[in-house]
Every structure is written in C-alpha cells, then in structure tokens.
C-alpha cells in the first residue's frame, strides 16, 4: 500500500533523527539487506545440530541447558566451547559450582590454555563478569555453570537458615534485562546450565521445575532438556551414557524435536558413531550385512571399524557430514517430532 507523501517525509525525518541520536542501524526495515540467517556454533552432536534446525546454537542469544545430575550438561557445553575454539573464537567459563575439571576439558578438545575461567564469590559478581565480557565484544561464547550455584550476596553474608525468598529470581530477572541487549550487539552466545527441582504438592502434570525464577525461561531463545536414558557397554563394562536431548523451546526454528546420542567417558559425544548412523540412514554410507561402504569402497566390517576408518580419514568424514547437514537441514519439517507436557511448554507463571 502506498504511503501518503507527507507521511513519507515525516517518517524519513523521524528515522534520520533516530539514527543521528542513537547511531546507524538503531532502526531499520525488517526486510532490509542484512544477514537474516542466524550464525550458529555446533553443539558437537550432529543429530542435536539437526534437531535445533539451524545447525547449532545461535550466536547473540541466551541458551538454557537443564537436566538431572550426571546427565551430560557440562560435557555438552564443553563440546560447544571446543567447537567454537576450533573456529578461532574466544570462550569463557564462569564456574560458579567450582567444579570444572581442566583434565577432562582437555580430553574433550578444549584448549584450556586459551579458555577464560572465573570462579566468582557471589551470583551478582558472576553476572557482572558475564555482562563485562559481553560488552567487550571480544568474547564469543560464555558458559555459566550453573544458575543454581549463583548465590546472591545477601545470602552468602547471612547465616544458614535465614529466609531469602525470591532473591535469586530477582537477581536473574534484573540480569536478563541487562544482558539480552548487550549479547545481541556483541553477537555473544551465553549458555546457562541449570538444575532441576521438584515442586511440592503437584498432583497432575510435570512436578519438575528449574531454579532461578522464570525470567531465564522467557529470555532464552533455546532451552534444552538433557537426560541419561541408558548405559553404553563393552562387555560387562559401562563405557558411556545413552543421552536424549529435547528442544523444549526454540525461537530460531521449529521446537519440540529431539536427538539421541552417546556420551563416552573420557571422550565426550560419540560424533563419528552419529555420522555412521546418519550416513546409513540417508544412504550416503552403504551397509550390507556387517560391512560398511562409502563411494563403493569398503570402509570396515562392523560399526567400530567404520568409525575407526572415519577417524583416520577426516576429509571423507567432513564430506559425509557436509552432505548430511545439507540433506537434513534444508529439508526441515516444521511438524514437531513429539509433544511435550503442558508444564514444559507453558511459561505463564508470575515473573519475580
């Protein structure tokens, strides 16, 4: 619809005044020629990258990863850091739980010599450090482990047993308002690890909830629910965990998809195992009996030998990965893989 000429002039004058006062790019038309695609970082799991719909976690956004104890939350974030560092990005780890193991991080491929690490005394200090790193524009990925360990200063200075109702929720709510804009401007990915608590007296629906109030649920562009669903065994020895991740919230693609992969102890996500499975599923790798073949050449008898061949031939592995991403990310179906409980999707509780 054509706009009246006088209105057009008035709009142009208003836009000019806004850009003069607040800087170029402070207001623009949504369809203007600028990058509409969200830049992403791989999670280290091919199936999870595909479930997210954009090929990874989005830059400039807030992401929440939550789940029970020993479900793989920290491992997943360390894999994200390793993937980001391989792309030459700068990463920071805010270790509020004081439990980061540098030896394990190195095994997962993290360059610990170039990883910024902070062990803050209070929750306010941790969030101020996050904000300062985001405003610097020099840090690409920040991980906070975990929201439950972000203890307000008043609680630390008080005595055990004192009531501090809603302090952590208010602190998080204030921090989210401040952080969201700074993260977008600096294109920094901020990942919060969170723990699960049980709501008392819930008769119907999901009794589980996450700590730190409701603000994080609203501000997060992606929320991932990670669970251990089984054990990976070699003979009688348990060598890893079968893991399922549900995309509970997704603002960059269709939500409610899920991914399943293995986390091997001391190694991290079994990426090459996923590559073999997805390659066979998409008919990029041929499977006849126990033999696996690629481009007509046999690459191994049994999955373990096929994985070994891919590790020894990184160029072929990269080629298969690229083809899988092109096939599955370009043909994303907007229909959810599954439905979540109403409590997972609902975010209408009172914000502190």
From Swiss-Prot:
- Segments of skewed composition (Acidic residues): 343-352
Q: Where is this region: Disordered?
A: 333-352
Q: Which domain of life is it from?
A: Bacteria
User: Gene3D superfamilies recorded for this chain?
Assistant: P-loop containing nucleotide triphosphate hydrolases
Q: Which positions are annotated as binding ATP?
A: 67-74
Q: Where in the cell is it found?
A: Cytoplasm
Q: Name one GO cellular component term.
A: cytosol
The UniProt keywords, alphabetically, are: ATP-binding, Cytoplasm, DNA damage, DNA recombination, DNA repair, DNA-binding, Nucleotide-binding, SOS response
Gene Ontology terms: biological process: DNA recombination; DNA repair; SOS response
Question: Where this protein primarily resides, as one coarse class?
Answer: cytoplasm
Q: Name one GO molecular function term.
A: ATP hydrolysis activity
SUPFAM superfamilies xref list: P-loop containing nucleoside triphosphate hydrolases, RecA protein, C-terminal domain
* Role this protein plays: Can catalyze the hydrolysis of ATP in the presence of single-stranded DNA, the ATP-dependent uptake of single-stranded DNA by duplex DNA, and the ATP-dependent hybridization of homologous single-stranded DNAs. It interacts with LexA causing its activation and leading to its autocatalytic cleavage.
The family database entries (PANTHER family) matched by this protein are listed as: MITOCHONDRIAL DNA REPAIR PROTEIN RECA HOMOLOG-RELATED, RECA
Instruction: Give the family from UniProt.
Output: Belongs to the RecA family.
Name of the featured protein: Protein RecA
Q: Which organism is it from?
A: Klebsiella pneumoniae (strain 342)
């Amino acid at each position: 619809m054509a706009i009246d000429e006088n209105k057009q002039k008035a709009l142009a004058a208003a836009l000019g005044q806004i850009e003069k006062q607040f800087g170029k790019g402070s207001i623009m038309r949504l369809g203007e020629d600028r990058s509409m695609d969200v830049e992403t970082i791989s999670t280290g799991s091919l199936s999870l990258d595909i479930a997210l719909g954009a090929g990874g976690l989005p830059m400039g956004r807030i992401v929440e990863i939550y789940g029970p104890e020993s479900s793989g939350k920290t491992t997943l974030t360390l894999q994200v850091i390793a993937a980001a560092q391989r792309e030459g990005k700068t990463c920071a780890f805010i270790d509020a739980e004081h439990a980061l193991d540098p030896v394990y991080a190195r095994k997962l491929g993290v360059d610990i010599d170039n990883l910024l690490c902070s062990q803050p005394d209070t929750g306010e200090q941790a969030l101020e450090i996050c904000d300062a790193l985001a405003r610097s524009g020099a840090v690409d990925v920040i991980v906070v482990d975990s929201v439950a360990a972000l203890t307000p200063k008043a609680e630390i200075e008080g005595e055990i047993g004192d009531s501090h109702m809603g302090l952590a929720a208010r602190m998080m709510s204030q921090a989210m308002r401040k952080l969201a804009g700074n993260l977008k401007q600096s294109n920094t990915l901020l990942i919060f690890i969170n723990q699960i608590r049980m709501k008392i007296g819930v008769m119907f629906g999901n009794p589980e909830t996450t700590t730190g109030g409701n603000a994080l649920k609203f501000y997060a562009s992606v929320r991932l629910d990670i669970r251990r669903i089984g054990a990976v065994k070699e003979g009688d020895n348990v060598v890893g965990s079968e893991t399922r991740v549900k995309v509970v919230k997704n603002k960059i693609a269709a939500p409610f998809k899920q991914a399943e992969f293995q986390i091997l102890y001391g190694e991290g996500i079994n990426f090459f195992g996923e590559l073999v499975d997805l390659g066979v599923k998409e008919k990029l790798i041929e499977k006849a009996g126990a033999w696996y073949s690629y481009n007509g050449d046999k690459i191994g008898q049994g999955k373990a030998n096929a994985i070994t061949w891919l590790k020894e031939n990184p160029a072929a592995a990269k080629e298969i990965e690229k083809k899988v991403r092109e096939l599955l990310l370009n043909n994303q179906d907007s229909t959810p893989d599954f439905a979540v409980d109403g409590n997972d999707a609902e975010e209408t509780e009172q914000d502190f």
